[in-house]
Each structure stands twice: as C-alpha cells, then as structure tokens.
C-alpha cells in the first residue's frame, strides 16, 4: 500500500514553527492518565513541536492558571512555545530562560521575534533568567539543542521539575518516555524508573522527530488491526523543519537535498519505540523492518511522506480507510487544541499536498 502523508503545520506550529515556522505543535491534556499530572511535549509533525499535556483533571478545575517556564526561550522553538502557550486556558508563562548573553535583558531586547504574530506585550517586558533551576517553575518546556539539552535537562529534573523536551538527546533513553498521546500514553509509566522521580519528583518526557510523528500517527491504527511486518518511507521535508536560518537559499531553491543529518536513523528507531509495548519497566520495540529515506525539498511548511507497508494480515482498501476514520483516541476529552479527527483522508488522486492540507484540524491533523 502506498499513500502520501502530509503533516499539517498549523497556525504556525512547526518545527520551524518549531523551529521556526512550520509545525505540528499542539497542547492538550488527557484526563485518562491516572494518578499524576504528567506533562509531555511533542514536537511537531513538521519540524517542530507538538505539545502534549497529560494531566489528571486538576487543570480543568483550578481557579488560576498553572505557572510554566520555557528553557531556551529566545530561539525559534522557544518562540513557538510562547506563541502557543501565551493564551492557553490552563497555563501561564511565568519564567523565560536563555543563554548568558540574554540573561538579565528584557525578552524584547534578547530575542529577535520571527513569527507571523506580534510578540505579546507582556512577554516582551519579561526579564530573561539564567538557565538554572533556581527560581524556575515546576513545569518546564525545553527548547534546547541536543548537545546543551544533554547537560541541562537532567539538572532541571533533578531539581524537581517536569521537563518536556523537544530535543533528541534523551528520546531513546530506556527510562525516558518518547510519547505521542494518541499512540502510546501508557509509556509515561517509564517516568517512575527515572532516579530524579524518586529523589525529587522531577522527570523528563520527550517528543519524537517531526517526520516520525506523522508516520506513526498513520501507522498506529493499521498496526493495531492488521499488524506490520515492513515499513518503507520516503520523506519530502519542508525547510521549516531545519529551523532558522535553516537551509541556505542557494542550496534549496530549485533543488532537492537528499540528506538530512541523522534523520533516517531517528525515524527508524523512534518509530519502533513508539509502536512498541510497555513490558514491565521498559519498552519492547515493535518487531518490524523499517527503512527511511529523508529529503529536504523547497517547500516552506508541511512535510510529505510516501509510505509502503507490508501487513501481517490481509486488509482491503475499505478496511484500511475504516481503521483511520475510527481512530479517535482523544475524542470527547475536551483537550483545547486536539483535533477531533487526527487522521483525515483526501480521496483526490493528487492529494494530499502540503499547501492545501497542512492546516487541516487547525494544523494538528495528518492527511
């Protein structure tokens, strides 16, 4: 079976929305996770973030908003966090942190705002704090490069913070959940295996690679009903996924770049972990063969993927469409930005297309 998948970038959620202009970010809560207010940020289907909030209902009933912080606030992903969170019904940005050269300045002085909506006046006047746990709120959205995240994120978790990370640094760590809420919320139980959870109550949760999210969203209902033996995916990834300033115009205009560093390895490993089963204190990855070929194309926002799969059990065209149409694991939960239909089918032979389909479900659906 072959079908292209376009990940939508919503009002601007992108990795590059994320990272600066494209993305599949979202923020929502899931009351079905019992016992704890678990937070998870998921990075975008196209290049950036996708935020996911898994909670216990406490946010719906509280009279005041819950304070949150953004680590790496002046960068492209940090700016997207601000855009997404500034008017969220449950959260209030109370702390912004960045590098030493930004610390002590107002946010307007420290950051060059590059998004398509105005910098909120309240945020512009906030003072940027040092990137240290002292004074930070208990919920942190981390928008750091992987090398920096590897050092900084455990420090905040050890200080008792819930760290929701957009970085790849700890995605494949055995005791760190890699989560898409529609797919594998039960993996959040791995939090209990983290030393920081036992010592201070803090923990880390990670989001997948932007291209992985769209792929796994489409595969999950098929894997549940028919099983997967083999997956072959070729991506056509928007420049938004490279962040800002991104790919030089002389490299990408009128061109296709058939290489994105570490992208293929990330897609292959993350897909199998996300579709794996929680077995005791660890995740048993899905037993399937997967091959990814990743390409950067001259499209501003919205990734496209061409996917071929081999099933364990035979399925008709109608059965596959039904599996997608009936996949609504978060329906009825009142999550602020979760799409009612996370997987949408475009029947036209020349669809999906990033320009035409990336904003379905307010940019949160896969087509």
Which residues does each predicted region cover?
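Short linear segments in intrinsically disordered or otherwise low-structure-confidence regions
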Residues: 10-14, 24, 35-38
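Contiguous C-terminal substrate-recognition/catalytic subdomains in enzyme active sites
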Residues: 133, 255-366
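N-terminal Rossmann-like NAD(P) cofactor-binding subdomain of oxidoreductases
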Residues: 55-259, 289, 332-367
């Amino acid at each position: 079976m072959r079908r292209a998948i376009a990940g939508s970038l919503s009002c601007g959620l992108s990795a590059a929305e994320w990272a600066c202009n494209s993305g599949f970010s979202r923020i929502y809560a899931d009351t079905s996770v019992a016992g704890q207010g678990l937070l998870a940020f998921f990075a975008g289907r196209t290049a950036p973030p996708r935020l996911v909030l898994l909670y216990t209902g406490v946010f719906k009933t509280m009279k005041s908003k819950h304070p949150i912080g953004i680590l790496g606030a002046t960068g492209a992903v940090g700016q997207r966090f601000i855009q997404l969170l500034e008017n969220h019904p449950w959260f209030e940005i109370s702390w912004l942190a960045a590098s030493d050269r930004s610390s002590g300045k107002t946010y307007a002085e420290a950051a060059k705002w590059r998004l398509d909506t105005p910098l909120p006046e309240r945020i512009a006047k906030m003072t940027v704090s040092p990137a240290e746990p002292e004074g930070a709120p208990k919920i942190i959205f981390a928008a750091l490069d992987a090398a920096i995240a590897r050092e900084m994120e455990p420090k905040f978790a050890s200080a008792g913070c819930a760290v929701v990370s957009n970085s790849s640094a700890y995605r494949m760590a055995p005791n760190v959940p890699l989560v898409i809420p529609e797919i594998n919320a039960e993996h959040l139980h791995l939090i209990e295996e983290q030393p920081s959870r036992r010592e201070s109550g803090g923990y880390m949760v990670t989001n997948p690679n932007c291209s992985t999210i769209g792929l796994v969203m489409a595969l999950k209902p098929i894997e549940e009903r028919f099983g997967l033996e083999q997956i072959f995916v070729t991506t056509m990834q928007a420049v938004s996924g490279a962040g800002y300033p991104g790919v030089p115009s002389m490299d990408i205009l009128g061109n296709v770049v058939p290489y994105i560093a570490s992208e293929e390895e990330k897609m292959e490993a993350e897909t199998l972990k996300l579709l794996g089963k929680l077995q005791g204190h660890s995740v048993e990855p899905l037993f399937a063969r997967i091959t990814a070929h990743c390409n950067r194309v001259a499209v501003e926002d919205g990734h496209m993927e061409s996917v071929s799969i081999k099933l364990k059990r035979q399925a008709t065209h109608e059965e596959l469409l039904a599996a997608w149409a009936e996949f609504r694991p978060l329906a009825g939960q009142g999550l602020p930005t979760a799409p009612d239909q996370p997987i949408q089918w475009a029947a036209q032979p020349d669809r999906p297309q990033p320009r035409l389909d990336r904003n379905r479900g307010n940019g949160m659906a896969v087509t």
